[in-house]
Curated annotation (Swiss-Prot):
Keyword Ribonucleoprotein listed: yes
Protein name: Large ribosomal subunit protein uL3
Self-association state and partner proteins as the record states: Part of the 50S ribosomal subunit. Forms a cluster with proteins L14 and L19.
Native organism: Geobacter sp. (strain M21)
Keywords of the record: Ribonucleoprotein, Ribosomal protein, RNA-binding, rRNA-binding
Cited function: One of the primary rRNA binding proteins, it binds directly near the 3'-end of the 23S rRNA, where it nucleates assembly of the 50S subunit.
GO terms for biological process, alphabetical: translation
Lineage, top ranks: Bacteria, Pseudomonadati, Thermodesulfobacteriota, Desulfuromonadia, Geobacterales
Gene symbol of the encoding locus: rplC
């Protein structure tokens, strides 16, 4: 993976292809991002760059943040993400990465935070079937038995149970770049991506693009 940047999800719309097909797309305001750090195999054990998005008032940043971004010479940022690279020689501190880094037809992976839906039961959270609604049934939406008694006398880890639904890191793979508006730093991606409007997402080359 050698391309990527941070963006902000604006919402979904639809466009028409040249053959008349209607395509649902997600509009992402991609960048401009600034390279604030480079990592090398010799020093850090892997090769990567760190990019920042969204200017932040220096008076609201601590000394560590200011010092971290000093080498880039572009101020302090609100959001930071790291991009693994095969080779970082093409990037220098302070370089600006914009939407034009991607082209129409590219396949990308998009990572974001899914919409939080609060505490949910097993039917909504995991898709359990549930029990009968009538005929004397006293079992409707409960999870039922969650383990054995004497052996093993415990509940196994990762048991599907009620709990927090959403608000977790989600990656959608192999989305197609339908259109790129370099003037306004907009990227139109085919399909849906995680998160709500104005949510921060990471767009990078698809790891399965060549498969």
């Amino acid at each position: 993976m050698n391309k990527g940047l941070i963006g902000k999800k604006l919402g979904m719309t639809q466009i028409f292809a040249e053959d008349g097909r209607r395509i649902a797309v997600t509009v992402v305001e991609a960048g401009p991002c600034v390279v604030v750090q480079k990592k090398s195999v010799a020093k850090d054990g892997y090769s990567a760059i760190q990019v920042g998005l969204g200017a932040k008032d220096a008076s609201r940043a601590n000394a560590a943040q200011i010092g971290h971004c000093k080498g880039a010479g572009a101020g302090v940022f609100t959001h930071y993400r790291e991009l693994r690279m095969d080779n970082t020689d093409a990037y220098n501190l302070g370089d600006v990465i914009e939407a034009a880094v991607f082209e129409e037809g590219d396949l990308v992976d998009v990572t974001g935070t899914s919409i939080g839906k609060g505490f949910a039961g097993v039917i909504k959270r995991w898709g359990f079937k549930g029990g009968r609604s009538s005929h004397g049934s006293r079992f409707h939406r409960a999870p039922g038995s969650i383990g054995c008694s004497a052996t093993p006398s415990r509940v196994f880890k990762n048991k599907k149970m009620p709990g927090q639904l959403g608000n977790e890191k989600v990656t959608v793979q192999r989305l197609k770049v339908v259109r790129v508006d370099a003037a306004d730093n907009l990227i139109l991606l085919g399909g849906a991506i995680p998160g709500s409007a104005n949510g921060v997402v990471l767009i990078k080359d698809s790891v399965k693009a060549k498969k």
